[in-house]
């Protein structure tokens, strides 16, 4: 034998029939996998031979072989009525008979693959038009030989295509076969050892990768937290920008409000000038009504009591201001205002003393001049006291026009202009019923309506209240004190 050519080397699905007794028809059958090799070789005289060899992976001693030359094939073809020649026979059985029974086997790496997909077996062509076949292997009881049979199967029958006898391989050939299997198993074991080492290395790498992945996950969480913090800081920055914009808008509104207050101050100054003119007119009218001052003497005592009440109210307000000054940041300004109020009170006390002295002088003059002169001087003193009351009422009227009274303090209701005018001048005064003399006072109802409109249109602010509290020409809305008469008659 000079050379060998492997025509077929695949694992087939077959039925193994093993005789259990001497009865030639009594077999024990079970499914198994056998490996079939078809080798093309040259004999001793150079003739072409086909070697059929079957083996099993689960039974190393299961090895049967048969050599088929042209002469033996002719006997086989005659016995089974084969229609192909010796050269075509292997190709036909491989492509049309054996291909239906090829099964997947595990390669050297332990992965199952279809042998038909391996390179080098291009001659295996699966013909879908060929009916399925069945392979039977009849094993003799002594296991020295077996019968290799191929059947064609139809839905209703099964027919034998051919059968050939294979002899058990023993001796050196079996030893060589076993050595080949051992070598293959050793190679697989070495491969498994390498795979085990690689698996251990991979496990170590996997553990390292898991640690890295865990650290990466921690970093990702930290990054997410940082991103969330950045978003929160951006939101806070937007809020700060909005607050700055709101502060700017409020500052502009405050500037506009200050400008409006300045305009209001100018208008108040103009009204004060007008009120001064009105006071001058009232002074002239009071001079003409000196004869009626005797009726006002009795009111002096009542006004003295009212002054004492005002002083008590002033003391209460002073104590309240002291308590509130501790809580306010502008303590120095409140103290200065308190001093101004004290100065106003002293000035008003001096006015009361002056009025009292004037009353005494008038009493002396009334004693010198007879009963009429005495009544005139008494009326004159009473008229002066009533003048202060009128000024106080005018101041209270201004306070009610320009700003509301502070919380907790009582306000004095302004009497109607007509009633107060008649009370001061008397029923027998030539100016009492003269409509022309009412012009300097302006219409009381319109003034009240104007004051209400002005009060509703302008919201009083603390600065406005402080201005009115500190203005000694209009009096104080806190202590309910009358205004200071700059040019007393």
Curated annotation (Swiss-Prot):
Which Gene Ontology terms of cellular component type are present?
Answer: centriole; centrosome; cytoplasm
Q: Where in the cell is it found?
A: Cytoplasm; Cytoplasm, Cytoskeleton, Microtubule organizing center, Centrosome, Centriole
Could you tell me where the Polar residues compositional bias lies? Answer: 473-482
Look up and give the organism this protein is from: Caenorhabditis briggsae
Where is the segment annotated Disordered?
Answer: 470-489
Provide the assembly information: Nine homodimers form a cartwheel structure with an internal diameter of 23 nM and radial spokes connecting to the microtubule triplets. Interacts with sas-5.
Q: What does this protein do?
A: Central scaffolding component of the centrioles ensuring their 9-fold symmetry. Required for centrosome biogenesis and duplication.
Locate the coiled-coil region(s) and give their ranges.
187-409
Q: What is its main location?
A: cytoplasm
Q: Which gene name belongs to this protein?
A: sas-6
Domain description: The coiled coil domain is necessary and sufficient for interaction with sas-5.
Lineage, please?
A: Eukaryota, Metazoa, Ecdysozoa, Nematoda, Chromadorea
| Residue ranges of domain PISA in the record | 45-97
Protein known as: Spindle assembly abnormal protein 6
Q: What keywords does the record list, in alphabetical order?
A: Cell cycle, Coiled coil, Cytoplasm, Cytoskeleton, Developmental protein
Q: Which GO terms describe its biological process?
A: centriole replication; protein localization; regulation of cell cycle
Q: Name one GO molecular function term.
A: protein domain specific binding
């Amino acid at each position: 034998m000079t050379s060998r050519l492997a025509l077929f080397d695949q694992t087939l699905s077959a039925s193994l029939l093993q005789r259990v007794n001497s009865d030639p028809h009594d077999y024990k059958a079970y499914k198994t996998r056998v490996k079939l090799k078809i080798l093309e070789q040259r004999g001793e005289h150079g003739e072409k031979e086909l070697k059929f060899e079957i083996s099993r992976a689960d039974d190393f001693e299961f090895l049967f072989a048969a050599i088929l030359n042209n002469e033996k094939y002719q006997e086989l073809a005659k016995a089974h009525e084969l229609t192909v020649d010796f050269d075509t026979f292997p190709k036909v059985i491989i492509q049309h008979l054996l291909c239906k029974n090829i099964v997947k086997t595990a390669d050297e790496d332990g992965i199952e693959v279809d042998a038909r997909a391996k390179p080098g077996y291009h001659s295996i062509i699966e013909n879908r038009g060929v009916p399925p076949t069945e392979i039977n292997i009849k094993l003799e009881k002594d296991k020295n030989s077996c019968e290799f049979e191929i059947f064609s199967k139809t839905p209703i029958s099964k027919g034998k295509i051919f059968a050939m006898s294979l002899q058990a391989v023993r001796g050196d050939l079996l030893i060589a076969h076993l050595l080949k299997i051992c070598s293959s198993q050793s190679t697989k074991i070495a491969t498994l050892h390498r795979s085990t080492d690689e698996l251990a290395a991979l496990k170590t790498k996997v553990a390292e990768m898991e640690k890295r992945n865990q650290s990466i996950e921690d970093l990702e969480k930290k990054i997410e937290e940082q991103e969330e913090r950045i978003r929160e800081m951006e939101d806070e920055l937007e809020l700060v920008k909005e607050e700055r914009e709101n502060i700017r808008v409020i500052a502009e509104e405050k500037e506009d409000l200050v400008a409006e207050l300045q305009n209001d101050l100018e208008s108040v100054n103009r009204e004060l000038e007008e009120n001064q003119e009105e006071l001058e007119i009232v002074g002239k009218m009071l001079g003409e009504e000196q004869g009626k001052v005797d009726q006002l003497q009795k009111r002096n005592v009542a006004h003295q009591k009212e002054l004492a009440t005002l002083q008590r109210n002033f003391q209460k307000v002073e104590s309240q201001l002291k308590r509130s000054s501790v809580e306010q940041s502008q303590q120095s300004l409140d103290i200065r205002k308190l001093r101004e109020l004290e100065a106003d009170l002293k000035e008003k006390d001096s006015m009361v003393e002056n009025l009292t002295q004037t009353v005494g002088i008038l009493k002396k003059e009334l004693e010198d001049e007879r009963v009429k002169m005495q009544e005139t001087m008494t009326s004159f003193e009473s008229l002066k006291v009533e003048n202060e009351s009128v000024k106080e009422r005018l101041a209270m009227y201004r306070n009610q026009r320009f700003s509301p009274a502070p919380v907790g303090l009582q306000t004095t209701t302004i009497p109607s202009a007509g009633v107060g005018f008649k009370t001061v001048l008397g029923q027998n005064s030539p100016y009492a019923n003269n409509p022309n003399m009412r012009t300097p006072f302006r219409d009381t109802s319109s003034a009240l309506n104007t004051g209400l409109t002005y009060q509703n249109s302008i919201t009083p602010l603390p600065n406005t209240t402080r201005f009115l509290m500190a203005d000694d020409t209009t009096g104080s809305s806190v202590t309910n004190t009358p205004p200071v008469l700059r040019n007393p008659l």
